[in-house]
Amino acid sequence: MTNINVRNYIDESYGLFINNEFQASDSGETLTVSNPANGEDLAKVARAGKKDVDKAVQAAHDAFDSWSKISKEERADYLLEISRRIHEKTEHLATVESLQNGKPYRETSTIDVPQAANQFKYFASVLTTDEGSVNEIDQNTMSLVVNEPVGVVGAVVAWNFPILLASWKLGPALAAGNTVVIQPSSSTPLSLIELAKIFQEVLPKGVVNVLTGKGSESGDAIFHHEGVDKLSFTGSTDVGYGVAQAGAERIVPTTLELGGKSANIIFDDANLEQVIEGVQLGILFNQGEVCSAGSRLLVQSSIYDELLPKLKEAFENIKVGDPFDEDTKMSAQTGPEQLDKIESYIKIAEEDDKANILTGGHRITDNGLDKGYFFEPTIIEINDNKHQLAQEEIFGPVVVVEKFDDEQEAIEIANDSEYGLAGGIFTTDIHRALNVAKAMRTGRIWINTYNQIPAGAPFGGYKKSGIGREVYKDAIKNYQQVKNIFIDTSNQTKGLY
């Protein structure tokens, strides 16, 4: 393992970030954050409780009036300054992200952190072009449409892309003029707390408040808090049900980006070199811990026997290991719970004669990796899309492969899922690509690539994969409410009474 001086990047302990100050939790309790690549403890973070949530929400509420009333240009300048400072600290923040999450530094330094910075920059531009409208309904009647912030936003983000997912919430929420209480996962909170140091230097007091704690404790308290006017959550569908219920109970608008079991469809005219890279992007990027992962690989029967051996070889040549080794292509799963979940699905495959593990399927413990949570890139062949392995989200570097004969069968298999977050199509026939894309019941379709999520392209799911869209200009509407000002310009009575 690369020898990283952790204290150059991570403090020994962190408090809650409330009203621009780092402070201990009301209970004084803490949580320990560990490095999943070697099992070593990284830092202690404050464990927020209900009183801390109350305090953070009050700080956000107190800051809302002044923050929401500043000019668009000034608010955009704040966002641009945050973006600039994130870019300046790319090496620092990317190192923190890799240490706490286990993902390769080559990903955090070129994707996670730069794209997080870009979200603030992008929504600064969205803000300055976000305009209401005037409609002259008739000669004596005028309708003004005004976009206004919702108020205090309560957000909780998952552990797989901590700083990036936080930026997906914070960029549009702040641009719209809201204040925010946000909580990262208890297993990966450090990059967002480090980001809070930038907020402390740049933003007015109380505009962003960062809590650390358990999702079932402080996270739940955020979602049920009477002072929170908008909910935003990225995580599992199981937890998403509870967030949706919390929003429904108080009639609070809710944005959800949840699970997926996305189909990556390979047609027989596809460029196989591009396919092999695309399949790996789909399921090995971020160790397969991606809600949009191409975890179901649908291969046209006529090229199945040609493609599978090449894919097997490619998976077996992936270097898994030290996240700071520049040759590492895949690193540690985020923790023991996730590794256990992956292994439970491997056991299902091993005990079922309808499933064939073509390659992988084992934890990696050699070459100094025994203290971390590393897993082999895995391919499992199945012949029934109703199989548990094809229907449930594994959330790891495990792809299940199925055959299809024609375009219509591919569409039917792809749509046979309770999820609808993403999907991929590999073909050189643009007509086929567009026809299949239109027929797939999913929010994002990649054609001849996979897992590209830049600012400016809407991302979000159909069905049980969520509600709302992110990383796109319309995402600002998630954090706005529309006011109509209806004006009678006639200066005359209507004669009705």
UniProtKB/Swiss-Prot annotation:
Q: Which Pfam families match?
A: Aldedh
Enzyme Commission designation: 1.2.1.3
Q: What class of enzyme is it?
A: oxidoreductase
Q: Where does NAD(+) bind?
A: 213-219
Look up the domain of life of the source: Bacteria
**Active-site residues, as the UniProt record annotates them:** 257, 291
Q: Provide the coiled-coil residue spans.
A: none
Q: Which reaction(s) does the protein catalyse, per the Swiss-Prot or TrEMBL entry?
A: an aldehyde + NAD(+) + H2O = a carboxylate + NADH + 2 H(+)
Position of the signal peptide: none
Gene Ontology molecular function: aldehyde dehydrogenase (NAD+) activity
Keyword line = NAD, Oxidoreductase
Q: Does the keyword NAD apply?
A: yes
Query: Could you say which protein family the record assigns here?
Result: Belongs to the aldehyde dehydrogenase family.
- Cross-referenced PANTHER family: ALDEHYDE DEHYDROGENASE-RELATED
Protein name (Swiss-Prot/TrEMBL): Putative aldehyde dehydrogenase AldA
Q: Which organism is it from?
A: Staphylococcus epidermidis (strain ATCC 35984 / DSM 28319 / BCRC 17069 / CCUG 31568 / BM 3577 / RP62A)
Lineage, please?
A: Bacteria, Bacillati, Bacillota, Bacilli, Bacillales
